[in-house]
């Protein structure tokens, strides 16, 4: 027996004979579509196939998953295939309708929980004052502007708008004014903007607006219960049970989550028993939410908020619950939406009226973000991007529209127009955000040379270090120690960025560490503290501590966009050099290194330690007693990268325990291998300046080495490579160099350049550490 509500508000009971869930098959004379399991699988297959087709067609516009899914549902509904009466009788009969409705509710229960559990409420605190002001403005301004627009519409149009009475139009206005952080998170994740400045500001602002919205919603429900009941003890009971439910979710469920975290070893995924426990808690919270008078989604959202944001929940929930939800439950969800959208029920007047209201509210959302952001001096490009992000709608919005329709708070016509409007606006706004953000990224150019070669001596040398593995921290600190000038005439500004890969579907973070302050008592926090303490010890170990400043950050971001935090910090701090520590040349490290090199606003040096560099902690003592010498080699073949390498090597000669040997590679006629006349002239000036600057330094030597082909270079490095502790080389060289011909064919770590890759190759078996340097990529041309 199934129970449904008809259009006139009465209940309709449908009784059907139980045939079983599985068919015996066509060969036995059974009709598979009369059984629930084959019918469900067929509908899922149809939606998945259609979604893939629409995904391919809309790919040039933007990556809007929800649009393609809803389109698939609409295509199966009365707007397209649903016009075929025979098909409707087969696929969308009474039995299938109730199957779809049930799975639709289950789907949204899981979607709302997973999308909420992904987001850390700490984003609000990190957003600062601007996020609070933006959130308050985003909560109030669209509603006020929408109310004015609603008044204009009702006063100028006779009758109803899309069969909505004034109360229904007000419900439409209220829900169009709301922005959901679950939608924003999904969009930012798809566009790989979670760890961008606009992404962080958008997410924190929307979460603040949602906090105001949820608070207002609870007050409204409480006020409504008082308004419609006599003042007695029973009046307070509904309010008390609602509060008790929310408190119970926190008090009961949070300890269970913490128990699961303790029982799950680090790096391991959720056990099946723990996953079942979470599902039971979710179903219980949802059921109790509906029982006490809340919409059922409140229970799943509340449970998502109390779910810890630490592993194993980030990857475990998405990999196990999320995959099933989006692959199996989501198709049923979009079919239920598509069956309620009928293009043939629309008329032009209703479309224009509702679009005017929706567009006005979207414009108010845009203004409520852009104006406060500009007042707080946020770059106009970032403010505009955030403004468009808050206008994007998604699956979450559509489900809220569906709830309004189920409770008769809006008409079928209004629901259809709102769904189509959400799809069109989201496609347009997502495409705008994607292209505008890409343009902003490409505009990350500097208006001065940020290189070691063009460093101004009267200013501090600014170096940003970044590393994916802790093992690379000691050699990086050693290189920093070598480049530090012991005199008081020069100062050093160091920024360290500890890179951590984001647990899937958690919120990206950029954490600044302060001396003596621990953020959390977790394993990851302990590692971060150790790294920040190492850099602080580096600073405190100098006699002239006032000449060395250190800032430590941890960037938690997806691996594909991790470089954006590095480059954004380098741009903000105006660093002259980025030093990237490479441990073993894994694919992830190489991709990250490549992205940093391509997007960096300054010069980049890639350090690959092979064990010869001493520990920086012992260098001070060894320098005083003269027991340590560090031999450095700089290979000069020609070009911008080699000039940058030489400039950095010369700076290291300020340390009395450093011996520098510059190997200038020339052909048989004592001529540079370069063909470019301008580059030759720049190389000549650089070498002449080097000779003048190091004339009185006894720890510097320049040798010109005759090299005609690649085999000569290989023999030179094999014979002399182990004489040095550190070999410095440029990454990029002219492709026409005969001396490098054939080396790139056997390259294993091409991010180090041809010579750098040769130095770390297994063929040479060298123990010297390698520092490969790339000068700043810029359109600025050096004076000839």
UniProtKB/Swiss-Prot annotation:
Positions of transmembrane segments: 38-58, 61-81, 97-117, 130-150, 201-221, 240-260, 286-306, 321-341, 351-371, 376-396, 413-433
Tissue: Expressed in pollen.
Primary localisation category: membrane
A Pfam family assignment: CHX17_C
Signal peptide (residue range): none
InterPro entries the UniProt entry points to: Cation/H_exchanger_TM, CPA2_transporter, Na+/solute_symporter_sf
Coiled coil: none
The protein's name: Cation/H(+) antiporter 26
Record lineage: Eukaryota, Viridiplantae, Streptophyta, Embryophyta, Tracheophyta
């Amino acid at each position: 027996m199934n129970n449904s509500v008809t259009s006139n508000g009465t209940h309709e009971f449908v009784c059907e004979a139980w045939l079983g869930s599985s068919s015996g098959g066509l060969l036995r004379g059974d009709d598979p579509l009369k059984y629930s399991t084959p019918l469900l699988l067929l509908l899922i297959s149809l939606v998945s196939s259609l979604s893939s087709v629409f995904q391919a067609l809309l790919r040039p516009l933007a990556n809007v998953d929800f649009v393609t899914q809803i389109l698939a549902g609409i295509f199966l509904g009365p707007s397209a295939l649903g016009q075929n009466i025979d098909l409707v009788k087969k696929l969308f009969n009474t039995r299938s309708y109730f199957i779809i409705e049930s799975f639709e509710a289950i789907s949204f229960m899981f979607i709302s929980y997973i999308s909420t559990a992904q987001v850390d409420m700490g984003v609000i605190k990190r957003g600062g004052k601007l996020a609070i002001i933006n959130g308050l403005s985003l909560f109030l301004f669209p509603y006020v502007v929408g109310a004015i627009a609603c008044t204009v519409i009702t006063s100028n149009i006779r009758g109803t708008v899309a069969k909505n009475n004034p109360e229904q139009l007000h419900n439409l206005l209220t829900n169009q004014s709301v922005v959901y952080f679950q939608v924003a998170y999904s969009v930012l994740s798809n566009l790989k903007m979670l760890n961008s400045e606009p992404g962080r500001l958008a997410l924190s602002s929307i979460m603040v607006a949602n906090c105001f919205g949820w608070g207002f919603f609870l007050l409204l429900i409480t006020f409504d219960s008082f308004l419609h009941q006599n003042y007695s003890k029973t009046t307070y009971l509904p309010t008390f049970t609602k509060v008790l439910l929310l408190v119970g979710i926190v008090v009961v469920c949070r300890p269970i989550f913490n128990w699961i975290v303790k029982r799950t070893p680090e790096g391991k995924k959720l056990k099946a028993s723990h996953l079942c426990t979470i599902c039971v808690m979710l179903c219980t919270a949802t059921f109790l939410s509906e029982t006490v008078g809340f919409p059922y989604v409140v229970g799943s959202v509340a449970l998502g908020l109390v779910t810890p944001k630490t592993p194993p929940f980030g990857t475990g929930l998405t990999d196990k619950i999320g995959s099933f939800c989006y692959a199996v439950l989501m198709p049923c969800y979009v079919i239920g939406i598509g069956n309620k959208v009928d293009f043939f029920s629309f008329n032009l007047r209703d479309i224009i009226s509702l679009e005017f209201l929706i567009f006005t509210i979207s414009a108010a959302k845009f203004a409520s973000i852009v104006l406060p952001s500009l007042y707080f001096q946020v770059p106009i490009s970032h403010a505009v991007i955030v403004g468009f992000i808050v206008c994007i709608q998604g699956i979450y919005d559509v489900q809220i529209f569906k709830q309004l329709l189920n409770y008769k708070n809006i008409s079928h016509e209004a629901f259809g127009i709102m769904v189509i409007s959400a799809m069109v606006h989201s496609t347009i706004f997502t495409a705008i955000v994607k292209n505008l953000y890409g343009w902003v990224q490409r505009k990350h150019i500097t208006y001065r040379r940020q290189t070691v070669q063009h460093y101004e001596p009267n200013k501090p040398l600014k170096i940003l270090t970044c590393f994916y593995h802790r093992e690379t921290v000691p050699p990086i600190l050693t290189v920093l120690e070598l480049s530090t000038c012991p005199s008081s005439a020069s100062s050093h500004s160091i920024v360290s960025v500890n890179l951590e890969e984001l647990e899937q579907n958690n919120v990206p973070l950029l954490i600044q560490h302060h001396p003596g302050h621990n953020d959390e008592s977790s394993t990851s926090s302990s590692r971060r503290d150790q790294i920040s303490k190492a850099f602080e010890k580096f600073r405190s170990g100098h006699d002239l501590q006032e000449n060395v400043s250190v800032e430590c950050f941890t960037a938690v971001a997806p691996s594909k966009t991790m470089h954006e935090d590095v480059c954004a910090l380098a741009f903000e701090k105006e660093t002259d050099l980025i030093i990237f520590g490479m441990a073993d040349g894994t694919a992830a490290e190489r991709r990250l290194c490549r992205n940093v090199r391509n997007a960096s606003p300054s010069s980049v040096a890639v350090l690959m330690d092979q064990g010869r560099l001493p520990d920086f902690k012992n260098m001070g003592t060894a320098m005083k007693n003269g027991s340590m010498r560090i031999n450095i080699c700089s290979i000069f073949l020609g070009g911008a990268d080699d000039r940058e390498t030489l400039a950095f090597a010369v700076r290291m000669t300020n340390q009395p325990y450093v011996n520098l040997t510059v190997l200038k590679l020339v052909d048989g006629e004592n001529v540079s291998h370069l063909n470019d006349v301008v580059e030759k002239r720049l190389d000549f000036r650089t070498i002449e300046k080097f000779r003048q600057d190091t004339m009185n330094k006894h720890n510097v030597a320049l040798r010109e080495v005759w090299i005609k082909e690649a085999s000569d270079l290989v023999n030179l490095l094999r014979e002399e490579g182990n004489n040095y502790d550190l070999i410095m080389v440029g990454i990029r060289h002219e492709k026409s160099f005969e001396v490098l011909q054939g080396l790139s064919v056997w390259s294993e770590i091409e991010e180090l350049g041809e010579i750098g890759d040769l130095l770390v190759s297994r063929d040479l078996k060298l123990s010297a550490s390698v520092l490969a340097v790339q000068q700043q990529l810029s359109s600025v041309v050096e004076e000839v």
